[in-house]
Design a protein with these regions (language model features):
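H-loop/switch region of ABC-family ATPase nucleotide-binding domains
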Residues: 80-81
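ABC ATPase nucleotide-binding domains
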Residues: 112-113, 117-136
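Conserved ABC ATPase "signature" region
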Residues: 1-16
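Helix N-cap at the start of a conserved alpha-helix in ABC-type nucleotide-binding domains
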Residues: 56-58
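Conserved ABC ATPase signature
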Residues: 20-24, 28
Length: 136
């Protein structure tokens, strides 16, 4: 019980400890799921689209929490598809299209060639026209 309360405190959800899970918002629910992993003393967190369906405030809270956990030595793997936020959110990225296209830092991986290989010619053309991403 102490571990659970400590984990809820870390994610800012202690005030909601007596609420039923169905009463939580999307962002609150994501933080509870992270607390669950922390209570199990997980060294790795695997998160599938943790920012889907939540508001900007919750997203900011969660990304700050994840950065704090990273700084504490936790390893975090996140599935994420919003290319506009990749540079500010992640240290390293993997581009996958049925197989690994590229892995490395954002600046190493976010190239027009890699993006074209991962997402097809349409995004490659968009990038070359200067639309929408910070791809080199």
């Amino acid at each position: 019980k102490d571990l659970a309360l400590k984990a809820l405190e870390k994610v800012g959800m202690v005030a909601f400890k007596d609420r039923h899970i169905s009463e939580l918002s999307g962002g609150q629910l994501q933080r509870v799921f992270i607390a669950r992993a922390l209570a199990q003393e997980a060294e790795w967190l695997l998160l599938d689209e943790p920012f889907a369906g939540i508001d900007a405030t919750s997203e900011k809270i969660i990304i700050e929490l994840l950065k704090q956990l990273r700084d504490e030595g936790k390893s975090i793997v996140i599935v994420h598809h919003d290319l506009h936020k990749v540079q500010s959110y992640f240290d390293d990225i993997v581009l996958i299209n049925k197989e690994v296209v590229a892995f490395g830092t954002v600046s190493e991986v976010f190239t027009a060639n890699n993006m074209g290989r991962a997402y097809g010619e349409a995004i490659s053309e968009m990038i070359s026209l200067g639309g929408g991403t910070n791809v080199k």
